[in-house]
């Protein structure tokens, strides 16, 4: 049987002409394609009540947390910074419940960009709400409108980590974020850093807890970059 990979979905709330003014539940196509290419069965989990998280996690084998909006600073007890962008507290709370339930059921988690940030927050860490508050900021972390296949900066992968087994010790990545990990959650360790010292990868300190995250977007380049696809292959088939 194909492993069932739940992808935590996003919601388009503001009306657009593309969808005739309808709200839409969605996930980026790259996640769907990458999971299918890895011989997994992708299932999009729509934003729902946190009370339903256990029922959703019961139905899947593994969980992917995707990118999207900023994370509400309510979750780490800070007032909103003036440069905070769009948030969706309902999504934050639902995905936080998914994380807690996946950990409870010992089901693996792969967290990408916002997903990695939320994972850190749920486990007790905090964020830079905008990189202007990071004193060592010197790297272009938001490369828009440059296409994702054109990597914008390097990351250093630390030895004795999961990512070190999957990636070169120095790796070029795309970058689309203005928030970043600040205080690392006590149960996590950093596995990759940008040249200006921001955390670009995480995993659990407990080897029995199967989770890892990256700050870049491998789902945007998996079709042209076999190394990025390898992250999905590993997660779906081995992790």
UniProtKB/Swiss-Prot annotation:
Coiled coil: none annotated. It comes from the Bacteria. InterPro entries: Class_I_gatase-like (IPR029062), Peptidase_C26 (IPR011697), PuuD-like (IPR044668). This is Protein NtpR. PANTHER family: GLUTAMINE AMIDOTRANSFERASE PB2B2.05-RELATED. GO terms for biological process: polyamine catabolic process. GO terms for cellular component: cytosol. Gene3D superfamilies: 3.40.50.880. The active site is at residues 113, 217, 219. Residues 12-239 form the Glutamine amidotransferase type-1 domain. It comes from Enterococcus hirae (strain ATCC 9790 / DSM 20160 / JCM 8729 / LMG 6399 / NBRC 3181 / NCIMB 6459 / NCDO 1258 / NCTC 12367 / WDCM 00089 / R). Keywords: Glutamine amidotransferase. The gene is ntpR. Pfam families: Peptidase_C26. GO terms for molecular function: gamma-glutamyl-gamma-aminobutyrate hydrolase activity.
């Amino acid at each position: 049987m194909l492993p069932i990979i739940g992808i935590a979905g996003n919601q388009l709330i503001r009306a657009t002409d593309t969808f005739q003014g309808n709200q839409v539940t969605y996930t980026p196509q790259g996640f769907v394609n990458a999971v299918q290419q890895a011989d997994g069965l992708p299932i999009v989990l729509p934003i729902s009540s946190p009370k339903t998280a256990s029922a959703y996690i019961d139905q899947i084998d593994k969980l992917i947390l995707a990118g999207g909006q900023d994370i509400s600073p309510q979750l780490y007890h800070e007032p909103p910074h003036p440069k905070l962008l769009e948030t969706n507290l309902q999504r934050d709370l639902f995905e936080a419940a998914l994380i807690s339930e996946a950990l409870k059921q010992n089901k693996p988690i792969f967290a990408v960009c916002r997903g990695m940030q939320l994972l850190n927050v749920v486990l007790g860490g905090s964020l830079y709400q905008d990189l202007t508050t990071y004193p060592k900021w010197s790297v272009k972390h938001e490369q828009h409108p440059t296409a994702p296949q054109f990597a914008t900066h390097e990351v250093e992968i630390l030895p004795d980590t999961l990512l070190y087994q999957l990636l070169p010790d120095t790796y070029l990545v795309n970058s689309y974020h203005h928030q970043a990990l600040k205080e690392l959650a006590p149960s996590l360790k950093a596995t990759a850093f940008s040249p200006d010292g921001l955390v670009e990868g995480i995993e659990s300190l407990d080897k029995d807890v199967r989770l890892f995250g990256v700050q870049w977007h491998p789902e945007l380049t998996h079709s042209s970059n076999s190394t990025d696809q390898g992250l999905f292959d590993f997660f779906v088939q081995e992790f």
